[in-house]
């Protein structure tokens, strides 16, 4: 996923319609899109398919964030069993689906946000399991991370309001999919009165949102 490239290509093709990139917490992404605060955005699946269309883009790796002097830094990959003796922090804005339960020992209280949890990891209070992009977003020199196997994964999609599928949104979808300027796919053909079926191929850290 290369938002900077999408922005560059958009500005080359739509010089009179600037594209602005925003950042929003995953929990706020749906309301931002539905409320018209953004035309399209990168969100974590699942989304409410009654109001949002989505195109799955990729599945993100899950990692465990630990202090740089933690014992787990001695291995290249961590298993849930390796966390048995650690307090695993579970922030209220966690984007992972722990159907089988969180590994390790639970904290007495759940941090309000992922950012708060990262501060607690730095203080040596516990470790944190997050998608890779969130580990990078909250990077600190005193922390590092390792891939966590057999953990829930987060799927990321490009999403937009079903009722607001404009030609500009269709053009942006085409850019995300790597289509050339001469491609007619991704935009409703003149006179068909329909919407392209490919918009319905998908089903919500930070989420990126675009506003034209």
Locate each region found by the language model:
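Secondary-structure junction motif
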Residues: 3, 76-110, 166
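A late-sequence structural motif
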Residues: 5, 146-199
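Short beta-strand-centered segments that line the small-molecule binding cleft or hinge
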Residues: 6-9, 13, 27-62, 143-146
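Short, high-confidence coil segments that cap the C-terminus of an alpha-helix
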Residues: 16, 37-38, 125-126
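Short beta-strand-to-loop elements that line the ligand-binding cleft
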Residues: 18-25, 91, 104-116
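A ligand-binding cleft/hinge motif common to bilobed small-molecule-binding domains
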Residues: 34, 44-52, 114-143
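Flexible hinge/capping segments at coil-to-helix
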Residues: 54-62, 66-88
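Intrinsically disordered, compositionally biased tail regions
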Residues: 201-212
